[in-house]
A protein has these predicted regions:
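Extended, hydrophobic alpha-helical segments in both membrane/secreted and soluble proteins
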Residues: 1-2, 202, 209-216, 220, ...
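PRPP-dependent phosphoribosyltransferase catalytic core
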Residues: 55, 68-69, 84-86, 91, ...
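A polyampholytic, Gly/Pro-enriched intrinsically disordered region
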Residues: 33-44, 273-279, 345-354
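Phosphate/ATP-binding catalytic cores across multiple sugar-kinase/actin-like superfamilies
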Residues: 71-74, 178-198, 211, 216-219, ...
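Short glycine-rich phosphate-binding loop at a beta-alpha junction
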Residues: 195-208, 326, 420-425
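Active-site proximal loops enriched in glycine and acidic residues that flank catalytic Cys/His/Asp
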Residues: 80, 91-92, 112-114, 141, ...
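Terminal amphipathic helices with adjacent charged low-complexity linkers/tails
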Residues: 143-159, 204-238
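Conserved short alpha-helical segments that host acidic/polar catalytic motifs at enzyme active sites
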Residues: 2-132, 138-201, 205-206
Length: 472
């Protein structure tokens, strides 16, 4: 739509990529702003040389950005530098993508992550400001810096996946939030292992899950403290020093079982090479697990495709001969695609979606897929603001536990006989841990913009038609 609008305006963009379209769009309104000022000053009988200087001084960056981004949809941080010396950084009106800045008498620096600025500029986190949603940080050639509204603000739906996985865990708030995500899973873990701490080894899948793992261990320790307190009270006045020592020594067994080759990044690998790559990423620490006695509990930050679990992690954990393997995800089920800057747009790649399909097949409800397809096709005929997510009713047929159970089956290789369980974060606990980043469309299907709803319906159409293309 933006591309066609440029054509209608008389522009000739050389390609349809997001970057080129945005550049052409802003460039068009920059030209228009320059022409407006030229006509204004020409009527005042200034010379062309004088007009050039006056345009550079009076160009209204806020106005041109307001006009250029009127029809933008999605999550974005856009930075631009103009030839005469003005610059800007603009954030989407829903605050989907993060942006922070620091300024003093000499410098202005903007980045998507606060710790990068803190490290580079050696400043306290309180000195780094968050760029407000729908605003642009405008840096004039003369050194004046202002935050100006460029697009009406929408409800804040900052991306929660940034907090779970993508952003650096060295940010103070993100670190605490990831710990909280792990801690909130402790009760579900205790239930799964039947509170058998003595025969359970706790570990994590390196390396982004490490902070959530610390939180999980703290949460498990709190549960253990409750057990120890109860035992001490039961002993009463008959307690001996040996009894007390034995009870107080009862602690979670915390080990580093999985070891990762830092040179291999599987999430960002292309589809063709990922399956082969993950087979060689992990190794394990031997000699810690009691064969056929110990349960292994491993924290992961999120489970998107399930490829790493199926092709590597569970295979190699199986060689340790545990009684049971429990994989814990600090994120809820990733059920829906993203179109706001993270390339996760093919539904067939999501293990949660594949679990849903398998459940529908098992229950003889495949006709519902046809219904969803028809609904999606109908949605495409509607104006964007009237579109609705036509996939949510499929997930609503099953509980989170049913889908998790099917996921556990899908990520377990055929030759593995050890029982595998998967525990996921709940949506309410996600929001409890990350209260300021409530954008949860990956998990809930509640997209903050009309463009997101169109993408999820198109993604399902592509899946149903066997079309292996991005949905946007």
């Amino acid at each position: 739509e933006l591309f066609q609008e440029l054509v209608d305006l008389g522009q000739n963009p050389k390609e349809k990529s997001d970057t080129v379209t945005v550049l052409e769009k802003i460039g068009h309104f920059l030209d228009d702003e320059v022409q407006r000022l030229f006509n204004w000053f020409k009527a005042e009988n200034y010379s062309n040389q004088q007009i050039n200087t006056l345009i550079a001084e009076h160009i209204d960056v806020q106005r041109l950005l307001q006009r250029a981004c009127r029809k933008f949809d999605g999550g974005y941080i856009m930075a631009g530098l103009m030839g005469h010396g003005d610059a800007f950084v603009m954030r989407d009106p829903s605050a989907i993508r993060p942006a922070f800045y620091y300024q003093d008498d000499e410098i202005v620096v903007v980045a998507s992550e606060r710790p990068a600025i803190q490290t580079c500029m050696n400043v306290h986190h309180t000195e780094v400001q968050e760029l407000k949603r729908g605003h642009a940080l405008i840096i004039k050639k003369n050194g004046k810096v202002t935050e100006e509204l460029c697009k009406d603000q929408l409800p804040r739906t900052a991306c929660s996946f940034e907090r779970i996985y993508f952003s650096r865990g060295t940010d103070r708030d993100i670190y605490l939030e990831r710990k909280k995500l792990g801690e909130l899973l402790a009760p579900a873990i205790m239930k799964e292992i039947d509170s058998d701490i003595e025969n359970t080894v706790f570990s994590f899948i390196p390396n982004t899950a490490e902070v959530a793992y610390f939180g999980m261990v703290e949460g498990i320790q709190k549960e253990v403290d409750k057990i120890n307190k109860k035992k001490l009270l039961e002993l009463g006045t008959d307690a001996t020093e040996e009894d007390i020592d034995r009870i107080l020594s009862f602690k979670p067994r915390v080990e580093k079982l999985a070891v990762k080759d830092e040179k291999m990044r599987t999430f960002i690998a292309d589809d063709a090479s990922r399956d082969e790559l993950v087979k060689h990423v992990y190794d394990v620490t031997y000699g810690i697990v009691k064969n056929n006695v110990d349960t292994l509990v491993l924290m992961d930050d999120s489970i998107v495709r399930g490829t790493t679990l199926r092709e590597s992690i569970i295979n190699i954990l199986n060689t340790l001969k545990p009684k049971k393997i429990v994989i814990v995800s600090s994120a809820p089920h990733i059920r829906y695609p993203d179109c706001y800057g993270i390339d996760m747009s093919k539904m067939k790649n999501f293990v949660a979606f594949n679990a849903l399909i398998e459940l529908l097949k098992k229950d003889g409800k495949e006709d519902l897929l046809k219904k969803a397809y028809g609904d999606c096709k109908h949605q495409e005929t509607l104006p964007p603001e009237e579109m609705q997510n036509a996939i949510q009713f499929l997930y609503a047929r099953y509980t989170d536990e049913q889908i998790s159970e099917k996921i556990a089956q899908l990520v377990t290789p055929a030759h593995v006989t050890v029982p595998v369980k998967v525990i996921y974060q709940t949506l309410p606990d996600l929001h409890k841990a990350c209260p300021n980043n409530n954008g949860d469309w990956y998990f809930s299907g509640n997209y903050p913009t009309a463009g997101g709803v169109r993408v999820v319906n198109r993604a399902f159409i592509n899946f149903f038609e066997g079309n292996n293309e991005r949905a946007y």
